[in-house]
């Protein structure tokens, strides 16, 4: 609705013409009180992201609550927890009915800008949620039912880097411990070792790192320079592991067979 008193000056008249032109482009009548047919759901997104910006550039815009209700920015709560060798990521959409959550996640993973609910509301995904989706796709996460997604625990560091500090994200205690141990292997508890040799600090760190990876079911490669004691670190690690499991497959050059044969638990 335009204020008729604004037609008193040439400046306002020129402004009115701009407003009328914008109204016509948006499907309204060029009148002081203008109407247009109801927006279809697929048109709501364009109306709010493009048409409304044009109106705002011309003056103050007030939007009724009923119209605002058709367009909502969706920032779901995200919960991450460990499930065995996997990470489970749950999405809780506040404005989406439970029966539509899987369709909303599909729209998010297909990089759509918005999702249209059965009630006709246009739900726009916020930028942070879209970044999370892109990361999960790169990690080849698998969509399940009920807003759940699973991926390997190896993704813990990437997810922590992206999601740390976001108010809508919660981590289980198990996930927090996993991410911390991956970042701080030097603080992992050193197991009881059955070796007579005294390990240097960096060798002890290597054993802690191997032990931490083994604890979470990961694998790793010691890549020190030659002569820094990779064989000793491996033997020390195996003395701890073989107390719990009597089986270990060792592939080694023939020059190391004697050293490895001295492992006794």
Predicted regions mapped to residue ranges:
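Single conserved hydrophobic/aromatic residue that forms the stacking wall/gate
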Residues: 1-8, 12, 263-264
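Generic detector of well-ordered alpha-helical packing
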Residues: 4, 17, 225-226
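Short loop/turn elements that form and flank the Walker-type P-loop nucleotide-binding site
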Residues: 5, 215-217, 244-245
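Charged, low-complexity
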Residues: 18-22, 26, 37-219
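Generic recognition of well-ordered alpha-helical segments
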Residues: 205-208, 236, 262
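Walker A/P-loop
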Residues: 217-235
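Conserved SF1/SF2 helicase motif Ia
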Residues: 237-260
């Amino acid at each position: 609705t335009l204020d008729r008193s604004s037609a008193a000056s040439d400046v306002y008249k020129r402004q009115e013409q701009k407003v009328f032109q914008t109204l016509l482009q948006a499907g309204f009548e060029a009148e002081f009180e203008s109407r247009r047919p109801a927006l279809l759901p697929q048109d709501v997104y364009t109306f709010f992201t493009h048409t409304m910006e044009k109106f705002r550039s011309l003056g103050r815009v007030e939007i009724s609550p009923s119209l605002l209700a058709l367009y909502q920015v969706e920032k779901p709560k995200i919960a991450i927890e460990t499930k065995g060798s996997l990470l489970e990521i749950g999405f809780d959409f506040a404005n989406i009915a439970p029966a539509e959550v899987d369709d909303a996640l599909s729209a998010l993973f297909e990089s759509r800008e918005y999702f249209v609910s059965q009630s006709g509301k246009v739900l726009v995904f916020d930028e942070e949620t879209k970044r999370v989706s892109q990361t999960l796709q790169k990690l080849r996460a698998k969509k399940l039912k009920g807003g759940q997604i699973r991926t390997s625990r190896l993704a813990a560091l990437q997810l922590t880097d992206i999601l740390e500090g976001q108010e809508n994200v919660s981590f289980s205690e198990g996930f927090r411990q996993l991410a911390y141990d991956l970042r701080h292997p030097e603080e992992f508890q050193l197991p009881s070792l059955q070796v007579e040799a005294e390990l240097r600090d960096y060798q002890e760190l290597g054993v802690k790192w191997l032990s931490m990876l083994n604890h979470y079911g990961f694998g790793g490669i010691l890549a020190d320079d030659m002569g820094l004691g990779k064989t000793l670190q491996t033997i020390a690690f195996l003395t701890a592991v073989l107390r719990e499991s009597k089986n270990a497959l060792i592939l080694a050059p023939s020059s190391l067979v004697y050293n490895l044969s001295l492992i006794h638990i």
